[in-house]
Amino acid sequence: EPLPEGAGFLRRAARFVRSDHPYVLLGTSAVAALALACTPGASLGAAGAVPSVVCFAWIALSLVALVFKVALRRDYRRLCPIARPGLRRPLRYLSYLVWACAAALLCMGPVAGFVALCRGAIASSTNPTGFLESAVYMLYNGRQLFITGVTTTIELALFGTVIAFFLALLLVFLRIQTPDRGENDAVRFCKAVGSGFARLYSTVVRGTPMMVQGAIVYFAGLAVLRGAGWETAHINAVWSPFWAGLVTISLNSTAYMMEVLRGGIEAVDPGQLEAARSLGLSQWQAMRKVVFPQGVKNSIPALSNELIVNIKDSSVLSIIGVFDLMFATTSVIGIYYKGLEAYCIAAVVYLILTMVFSKVLTMLAARLDVDAPGPVGSTTDPAAAPARARQS
């Protein structure tokens, strides 16, 4: 495979820097000096003492080598004790340590400044005017609201996705039913009705926003309970916004998961079903023992991606009073009257949640020997599962 243009020159230059002794010393000392110059020692405290000492020691060693180089000139490699062949490899390894110390010094300055900023914001009695100071102040003083919102968001996403998975298993069985001429009229009618219901359910749910679905579910539940003669206090105890949000996420995700499972099942080789039937298994036994397990495995990446989608899409349920992360954010805004800082905090928290759960799902997919979940989108792509299955 040919190297890109310029790669050979860069490789030779890197080999020259690594092998030529004076450049290892002087180049690394320049990096150490830059790190010391950009990092005031007073702001680091005891934490920056060791990296600073290492950088100063390397600079001193490089100055000694420079003095020998100027004094000995052509005899430098032969007479200088630092330039002995046996010391070149240890010095190169020590230069890596100096680079690490220089990087630590460069990072300590901003980190120390941010820590000082956080301490000042937390100790403040009023909301600071600066953006970062105000965000830290609001995050610290509203931490109970944010913790409650994050907990509710995770509960809705986890339980809603699990419930939707089992509902999707039932609906996908109805969805893939096709009437057979050899069956009696009652069985054919039941299959047609079941498949039609699954198609209609998928069309309606996937064609309407979750925000509208949440409002319909919540107020429909209130109307049913009020029609049954329940009092308002009893209704609020039984039909809270949390339960309405959980039902909404479960019903919404069921439609998407059903299509994902259908794609995974249709990606299974039809010959396996025929082979199972030829061995004496009934249609239900062949589907349950042969086709369904493979279809579910093909669909795991897209199904796990639905959990990430639910973490983000649950934010729309705040309109019915679900105390999720978005509701907590609006509550903090109502207290401090600063929207930009609060919404930036919510964005960072959502990003952390999605990254953590994506990493966990990727590790789970590796243990199950399936493809990792793809890029996180706003909706689950039903075609993802069969496409991956055909590629494998």
What are the roles of these predicted feature ranges?
Residues 2-392:
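Transmembrane alpha-helices and adjacent helix-loop boundaries
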